[in-house]
């Protein structure tokens, strides 16, 4: 069974975007390539248990095992040595990517306190969108009682769009609630 958002993309969004941007071929229509979730755990330097908890939470949120990220350089001011584990990231593609986007747009974002829509200025100029989440508690898989520290995470949606305008339209069609 194909994902609901994937079917919507093929049957509704693609024809709409072809009409709106006058593409000559349906292959020119921008699509979502991947979604990267990144959780920086700066306090993992002093307590490595914090990193294990962050990895477990990221695994619950994404449905796949995160990659532990390591420091590239030593920074004495942060008591950081090169090669120390300081975060975790997950790259979602295919089915899991569409599942996550569906969950993000329809379940998680509406659970954010006094939510007025996501910023429409967070595009990078090449059609990719970055969204920062202040607390991981907005995701339904995270049990409030088992969380000992509120952590934020970065969500990067990488598209094949050439311009921010095309990318914004694509995400808006997927139901991303941009602020007015």
From Swiss-Prot:
PROSITE patterns: RIBOSOMAL_L5. InterPro entries: Ribosomal_uL5 (IPR002132), Ribosomal_uL5_bac-type (IPR020930), Ribosomal_uL5_C (IPR031309), Ribosomal_uL5_CS (IPR020929), Ribosomal_uL5_dom_sf (IPR022803), Ribosomal_uL5_N (IPR031310). GO terms for biological process: translation. Pfam families: Ribosomal_L5 (PF00281), Ribosomal_L5_C (PF00673). GO terms for cellular component: ribonucleoprotein complex; ribosome. It comes from the Bacteria. GO terms for molecular function: rRNA binding; structural constituent of ribosome; tRNA binding. The keyword RNA-binding applies. Gene3D superfamilies: 3.30.1440.10. Keywords: Ribonucleoprotein, Ribosomal protein, RNA-binding, rRNA-binding, tRNA-binding. This is one of the proteins that bind and probably mediate the attachment of the 5S RNA into the large ribosomal subunit, where it forms part of the central protuberance. In the 70S ribosome it contacts protein S13 of the 30S subunit (bridge B1b), connecting the 2 subunits; this bridge is implicated in subunit movement. Contacts the P site tRNA; the 5S rRNA and some of its associated proteins might help stabilize positioning of ribosome-bound tRNAs. PANTHER family: 60S RIBOSOMAL PROTEIN L11-RELATED. Belongs to the universal ribosomal protein uL5 family. Part of the 50S ribosomal subunit; part of the 5S rRNA/L5/L18/L25 subcomplex. Contacts the 5S rRNA and the P site tRNA. Forms a bridge to the 30S subunit in the 70S ribosome. This is Large ribosomal subunit protein uL5. It comes from Pediococcus pentosaceus (strain ATCC 25745 / CCUG 21536 / LMG 10740 / 183-1w).
């Amino acid at each position: 069974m194909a994902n609901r958002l994937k079917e919507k993309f093929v049957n509704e969004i693609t024809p709409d975007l072809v009409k709106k941007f006058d593409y000559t071929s349906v292959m020119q229509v921008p699509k979502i390539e991947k979604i990267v979730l990144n959780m920086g755990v700066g306090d993992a330097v002093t307590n490595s248990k914090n990193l294990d908890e962050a990895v477990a939470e990221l695994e619950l949120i994404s449905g796949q095992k995160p990659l532990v990220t390591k420091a590239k350089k030593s920074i004495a001011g942060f008591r950081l040595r090169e090669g120390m584990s300081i975060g975790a990231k997950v790259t979602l593609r295919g089915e899991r990517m569409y599942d996550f986007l569906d969950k993000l747009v329809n379940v998680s974002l509406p659970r954010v306190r006094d939510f007025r829509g996501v910023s429409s200025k967070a595009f990078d100029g090449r059609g990719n969108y970055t969204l920062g989440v202040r607390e991981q508690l907005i995701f339904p898989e995270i049990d409030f009682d088992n969380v000992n520290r509120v952590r934020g995470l970065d969500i990067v949606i990488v598209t094949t769009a050439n311009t921010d305008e095309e990318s914004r339209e694509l995400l808006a069609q997927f139901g991303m609630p941009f602020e007015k």
